[in-house]
Amino acid sequence: MSRLAPRYEWALLGLITAGAAVLRLVGIGHVAPDPFYDAAVRSMGLSWHNFFFGAFEPAASVSIDKPPVDLWLQVASAKLLGFSSTTLKLPEVFAGIAAVPLLYLAVRRMWSGTAALAAAFALAVLPVEVITSRSDTMDGVMMLLIVLALLLIVRACETGGSAWLLAAAATLGLAFNVKLLESFVALPGLAVFAYLGLPGRPRRRLLQLGAASAVYVAVALSWLTATLLVPAHDRPYAIGSSNGSAWNAAFVFNGTERLGGKSPEPQFTVYEPGRHYPEATQSERDRIPIVPPSATRLLARIGPLSGQRFGLELLVALLLGIPALVSGLRQSGYGEDDAQGKAHARMRRAVAGGLGVWVLTGIVLFSDMARLHPRYLEALAPAVAAMLGIGAAWAASARGRLRGAVLAGTLVVVAIYAERLLYGAPIAWWVTLAGALGGIALAVLARLPSVPEGVRSVLAPAGVLVATLIAVAAVPLHADITSIRTHVTDAGYVGALPIEEQRLVSAYLRAHQGRARYEVAALSATQIGSLVVQDARPIVILTSYNARVFTSIAKLRHLIAQGKVRYAFLNSNCAGHLSSGNAACSAPARWVRAHGTDVSAQAGLSRGKVLWLLPGAPA
């Protein structure tokens, strides 16, 4: 297989990458920010101490629940271009764009140029990836690092050199530092890929993988280990942890609890199996919680993880990719007796085993995961796009009736599934249908003996591939355009305040602050992010995750007596049936309501019992 792509491939890749850039850049200034992580970026830009630990608020009493590696990029962007919602999203945007040509390079080396272009196109238009890249979350950067690691492993398999493999391991270690256990989804598949694809005897390959594992662990745990070198009293309390430890937050809060825990975030209309939602707008369907764990969860018709955004491409990747990988195992394409033939056969085995395990791991995990967000599928997206590209290129070939039958069956399934996803027959479905019918017709044409050889061997297969990609991409592109038009984000709203309320609270606190060090005592970090973003002033955090008391009543009274804090912001009420795990029902919150003075009306707020003058603080 030639390693130098023809000019037309580079031109097509340029068009695909440009399209990916358009989908990720248009209107990103209108996409809602993530107040929680944006507050951390704001605080991290104030000092090197805050920068290293990922401090949530300027005084660095608490830190975010993850290593702040991705946020370091956002801080750099804000320092260079100014702090804004747009500049904070740029690292994610460019990560999503860069992943497209990187995936092309990887798939071209391990399969073919045609498959690589199809894979790059599939990733470029995948709605889950587009939406995540337009949001200021960490997942896009993690995905880019995983794709880079895949490319490095492919190079290691080609050359047999350990340096490429060790570089891949270090890259995956960085991916762990960006999004922790989410990056584990790719690990089993990439390990299988490396073992099957590396040349040499099994013992040598195992030794290489052992060395790579050591590098991975060293890089993955580097930040967590570095935090232990700082005295405990100088380390912020890690939000989400049960003991303030960043290790606990990483492996418990973001590990075991994610697999089986109940999401603490507010839910909207409860999903009802069997209910039809044709009358709902797409934005209303997005507010329906993700379908509960099940074998068909990733193919759901509704919700923020509907088949429009991921399931359709996943289905095509399975229907076309599996037979393509199996066929690749049976037909290496070269004589097995020469070195080139052995290398080719070895790469095909690595692709089949590695991508198969990667996709299987992701499907099993995300189908059963209790607390699932669409952005988590970034760890699976490259494998799905690669399998789809390989499968589409294989099926579009003019060779064999089996390929034509598989392609025709897949396109029929795509047309039926697309109609169900779109709740009727809008333009996107007609495009899907036209692409499916065109692909089937051209596949039949390519296999007619009366058709000239040039048409059968070149033009018809190219047309089949284009028609197939049109059929597959119509629904995802429809979802992309809808998400751009409606400013969909996959970032959280934790810490968001109504804009007018935020303005009034900020103005009142500035006018009545005096010389207090802390702007306000907040019920929790999850309620005050917007104010930190706007004012960048220290905050007293009363409770951590699950209403664990972080600032005791005695400590709060001490701060009041010292004149360091005068006001409290309690953005929720204590309902009796929700008292367990509710920060509004914590001891500090009850004490503020019992002894403080409600000044919400004086601040101009439309609701009461939100802003409080603390007892003992001068009026």
Where are these regions (language model features)?
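Composition- and surface-driven signal marking solvent-exposed, interaction-prone regions
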Residues: 377-381, 391-395, 399, 456-466, ...
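A glycine-rich phosphate-binding loop feature that marks nucleotide/adenosyl-phosphate handling sites
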Residues: 319, 464, 525-527
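Extracellular low-complexity, O-glycosylation-prone Ser/Thr/Pro/Gly-rich "stalks"
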Residues: 161, 439-450, 454, 593-595, ...
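Membrane-integral, polyisoprenol-dependent glycosyltransferases
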Residues: 1-417, 423, 496, 545-547
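Extracytoplasmic/secreted proteins, especially bacterial periplasmic and envelope-associated proteins
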Residues: 36, 40, 68-75, 245, ...
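Transmembrane helical bundles and short interhelical boundary loops of multi-pass, membrane-embedded
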Residues: 398-499, 503
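Active-site lining segments that contact anionic ligands and/or coordinate catalytic metals
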Residues: 247, 361, 374, 403, ...
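Short periplasmic/luminal acceptor-recognition loop of GT-C membrane glycosyltransferases, typified by
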Residues: 17, 470-548, 557-615
